[in-house]
Amino acid sequence: MATVDIALANWVLDEAKRKGASAAEVLCVTAESLGAGVRMGEVEKLKSSRERRLGLRIFSGQSSAISSTAELERDSLAAFVANTVELARLSAADPWAGLPDPALHPNSLPELSLADPDSGIVTADRALEIARTAEKAALKFDPRMKNSEGAEFNSGRYQVLFANSQGFAGEYSGTSYSLVVQPIAQDGDAMQQGFWYTSNRRFGKLEDAESVGITAAKRALRRLGARKIKTMRAPIVFDPDMAAGLIRSVVGAASGPSLYKGASFLVGQLGKSIAASGVTIVDDALIPGGLGSKPFDGEGLPTSSKNVVDKGVLATYLLDCYSARKLGLAPTGNAARSVGDAPSVSTTNLYLEPGTYTPAQIIGSVKQGLYLTETIGFGVNMVTGDYSRGAGGIWIENGELAYPVQEITIAGNLKDMMAGVEMIGNDLNWRSSTVAPTLKIAEMTIAGA
């Protein structure tokens, strides 16, 4: 994989200064990927891509502009730089815009093991074999497994190089592998789709393809025979995927842009209790091999591990330099950007610290309630914290999973929901960059028939 070297990035920065820029930064991303999909054993997708792009952010005083290009010859780049400088000169000034304080740039970068040393891009034949194996395992698991939305395997590798006119330069490389399968179970006229996936930076650490297929089949089968329920208030047990979505919503309200726009229910809540005392939510960019790990953020600032919520208390907001300046706070190393866009705010590896309960113990504590396994639509108002989602899952009776339910809506308010977290599971599993164990909320409205 041909990558961009630091010499070219520095030449672009020098050219920007020669053309009149007061400050500049360069982001170069080189990526290669292969995706292979099958449906009912037949090839449905086979796509390979290679790309090198350079993004340039130019400042002319407090005015700025961003451009990107895939033409990396110096003659083309010289014209590209000149055009971006002119765009910055013509843009409106913004008093909050600018590069970070140079003193904040790291002197050294951590080694985070983001690239698989043993595997690169998986071959097309191997990728198709893996996808077929997963789908076949799902369809063979039970006679009621009648159809499939398909299975897909993806592999990729990339290099990120960042440099700015303050003298900071850094780079890192990574790999990623994922497999997803979506089989369909049928019993009479009733059909239900299952879904399961595995992802990792190391090919050898992926869940076995047959196991992924079987899990997806089980999840489809357990949805057959779904019933409707009456409207009531009852406990809800969030499975790990649903719990991860919940904490993503909560932490999204702690994002700088939402805060300075006044569009978050967490405005003014820093240092205050927003959840039960057992709730600690961590954003950790430094987990070796983590799917969201990176040694520096999208503005060249050091990343870190930090408790966003610490024993129920909102301990920090997540900020890039722009939102930090507007809020009068320090940036947190959570800037993220693509080659053609301005920095935004993003989490890295976000997780809810696990508790001591097994999922069986949590379910066993519920006399009557919902084990939540799916939600539909967005339905979260970040300004008020109001939460209302179409949902499905398995009804709990006397501490046991009794029967599937669907066509229901669950509703509450995020602050009330987080304050009502009663039990947290010990089943944290790193399958994505945002994860959580099983958790139980004391009571929510469940609207049924």
State what each model feature region is:
Residues 1-449:
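N-terminal small-residue-enriched
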